[in-house]
């Protein structure tokens, strides 16, 4: 079901913010860690047999890759005496080993061995684990407040299924820790009007479509490139009216696609909450190859577009790091509808203190709802 917000009002002159947000506005959830798949590492940063310490969702985590190559994500603390497995922990075969007393733990969090005990292991002891997977060179972890299983899977990216595009990794990787709630990053999809001011575009951008459905947000923005100039490196044949497509999957994964009239490109971003204040912003992009180029390093216009976009992304940081969330913002008629739709959609990813039969994505017994699996 696609969520829509009526544009009708008994008083056509009513303030758009009042009409779309209501008298109370739309609050930001007091629980800061939304449901969804989140990037917790680049795959290349975790070799076979390696252990990596991490801190996400307000928790200390440990990532490890077994000798067979399987990735696991779990809470960091050994359930023997509380040692941090991410500090000095090692991998033996398919298990992670505590550096303090050598207790071994399987990837599913169960105790595999107490090396000095006649009981062998404690079958009733378990470390909390996070569902994890590798997706186009990223390690993803599923976060859900109550530990419920994933109800959707990350999308297939057609651009990365062939050799027509340069690889996402490693030459386009960028990671920044930003003082911002991940939802504020997603709100860029409802805000084409900042492009002219923050990113110094010569002409304003406008939204041509905006919809939210299930765990998926899809928006199309019309933007003008090369205005007032006969030719630029990005628009060698003159100004271009380009259609930029935004897709967000829950609040953790984002895609931005640029058309071939510029440089055909797919950007892949991850907004992963570290704690109450900070978010790790993962960024990569893949552009169509330059004619005849079979290498992995972007060249020509693809390389220039990568450098440009990496700088453009950083231009948003100063606003995010210094802003205040307004529950009832004062918006122009052109922007109120989409902002309100996005914020209402985002609320479904913040379950309450206890599981509820009304929680999006789950049945009354807490199982993933098949109806919610559709993008």
Predicted regions and their residues:
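Short, charged N-terminal helix-start/capping segments
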Residues: 1-5, 9-12, 17-30, 199, ...
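Short charge-dense sequence patches
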Residues: 3, 7, 23-27, 131-141, ...
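C-terminal catalytic domain of Rieske-type non-heme iron oxygenases
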Residues: 70, 151-375
């Amino acid at each position: 079901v696609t969520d829509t917000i009526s544009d009708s009002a008994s008083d056509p002159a009513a303030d758009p913010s009042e009409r779309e947000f209501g008298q109370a506005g739309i609050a930001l959830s007091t629980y800061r860690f939304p449901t969804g798949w989140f990037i917790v590492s680049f795959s290349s940063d975790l070799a076979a047999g390696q252990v990596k310490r991490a801190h996400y969702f307000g928790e200390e985590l440990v990532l490890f890759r077994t000798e067979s190559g399987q990735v696991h994500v779990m809470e960091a603390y050994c359930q023997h005496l509380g040692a941090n497995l991410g500090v000095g922990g090692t991998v033996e075969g398919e298990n992670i080993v505590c550096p303090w007393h050598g207790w071994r733990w399987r990837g599913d969090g169960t105790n595999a061995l107490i090396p000095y005990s006649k009981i062998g292991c404690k079958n009733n002891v378990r470390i909390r684990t996070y569902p994890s997977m590798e997706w186009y060179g990223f390690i993803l972890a599923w976060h859900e407040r109550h530990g419920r299983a994933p109800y959707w899977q990350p999308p297939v990216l057609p651009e990365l299924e062939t050799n027509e595009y340069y690889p996402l990794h490693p030459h386009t990787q960028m990671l920044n820790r930003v003082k911002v709630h991940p939802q504020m990053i997603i709100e860029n999809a409802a805000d084409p009007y900042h492009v002219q001011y923050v990113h110094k575009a010569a002409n304003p951008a406008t939204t041509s479509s905006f919809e939210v459905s299930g765990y998926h947000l899809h928006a199309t923005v019309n933007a003008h490139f090369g205005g007032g100039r006969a030719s630029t490196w990005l628009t060698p044949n003159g100004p271009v009216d380009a259609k930029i497509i935004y897709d967000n999957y829950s609040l953790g994964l984002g895609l931005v696609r640029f058309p071939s009239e510029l440089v055909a490109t797919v950007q892949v971003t991850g907004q992963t909450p570290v704690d109450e204040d900070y978010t790790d912003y993962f960024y990569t992009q893949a552009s169509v190859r330059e004619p005849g180029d079979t290498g992995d390093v972007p060249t020509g216009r693809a390389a220039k577009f990568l450098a440009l976009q990496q700088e453009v992304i950083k231009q948003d940081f100063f606003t995010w790091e210094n802003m205040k969330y307004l529950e009832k913002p004062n918006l122009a008629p052109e922007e109120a509808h989409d902002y309100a739709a996005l914020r209402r959609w985002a609320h479904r990813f913040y379950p309450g203190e206890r599981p509820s039969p009304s929680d999006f994505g789950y049945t009354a017994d807490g199982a993933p709802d098949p109806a919610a699996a559709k993008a």
